[in-house]
């Protein structure tokens, strides 16, 4: 995957971007680790195949920071910079505060409808709306929703922000950096555009 220099015009606040078609991926993307990179890369390839923009929708702060007190792995500036280096056409950063947390799942669906997503790529554990009322199955009632499989490390463990955070807290920085995966590895660049599954399939 070709990296490009991140530029400010790529970034939008929630409810400010409207498109006539897109491929969308949504997530906290805390740390933009190797699993996130693979997911975003797959969404970008889907967009290129369809000839429409790719959009990465993320949150500041990551929801777990507000809901569970988890310390973010990166600042929003660093996160947006890393996502921008992967090369999507647009980045939407939603301010995850008490007001956003109170929004319903239907509110979220109405918002992302403005992006006219032809395909939405998400992780299997993605939830949205107040009290996590929305899930992939609900999203699939409105959009072509595809689940990206978890990325595992060589030891077989799933790469996750929580795992990286635990490694950092234990002082195991080399292991954490390996899971973070910067720079993006060639093996992740080759992830198939068909690597996910349709919700309900």
Put a short name on every predicted segment.
Residues 6-8, 13-14, 57-59, 93-96, ...:
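Conserved beta-strand termini and adjacent loop/short-helix elements that scaffold enzyme active sites
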Residues 27, 58-60, 122:
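Short beta-strand/turn micro-motifs composed of small residues
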Residues 32, 65-68, 129-130:
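A generic structural signal for short coil/turn motifs at secondary-structure boundaries
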Residues 21, 89, 118:
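Conserved acidic residues
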Residues 23-37:
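Short, glycine-rich nucleotide/cofactor-binding loops
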Residues 1-25:
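Positively charged, low-complexity intrinsically disordered leader regions
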Residues 94-99, 106-201:
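Active-site cores that bind ATP or allylic diphosphates and position pyrophosphate for catalysis
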Residues 38-111:
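Core alpha/beta nucleotide-donor-binding catalytic domains of modification enzymes
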């Amino acid at each position: 995957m070709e990296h490009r220099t991140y530029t400010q015009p790529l970034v939008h606040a929630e409810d400010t971007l409207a498109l006539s078609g897109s491929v969308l991926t949504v997530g906290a993307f805390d740390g933009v680790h190797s699993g996130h990179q693979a997911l975003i890369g797959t969404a970008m390839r889907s967009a290129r195949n369809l000839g429409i923009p790719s959009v990465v929708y993320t949150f500041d702060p990551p929801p777990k920071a507000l809901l569970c007190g988890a310390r973010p792995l990166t600042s929003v500036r660093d996160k947006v910079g890393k996502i921008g280096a992967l090369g999507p056409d647009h980045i939407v950063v939603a301010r995850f505060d008490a007001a956003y947390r109170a929004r319903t799942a239907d509110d979220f669906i109405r918002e992302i409808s403005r992006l006219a997503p032809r395909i939405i790529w998400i992780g299997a554990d993605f939830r949205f709306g107040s009290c996590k009322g929305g899930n992939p199955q609900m999203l699939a009632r409105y959009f072509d929703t595809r689940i990206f499989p978890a990325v595992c490390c060589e030891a077989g463990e799933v790469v996750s922000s929580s795992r990286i955070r635990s490694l950092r807290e234990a002082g195991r920085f080399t292991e954490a950096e390996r899971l973070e995966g910067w720079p993006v590895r060639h093996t992740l660049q080759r992830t198939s555009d068909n690597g996910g599954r349709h919700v309900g399939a």
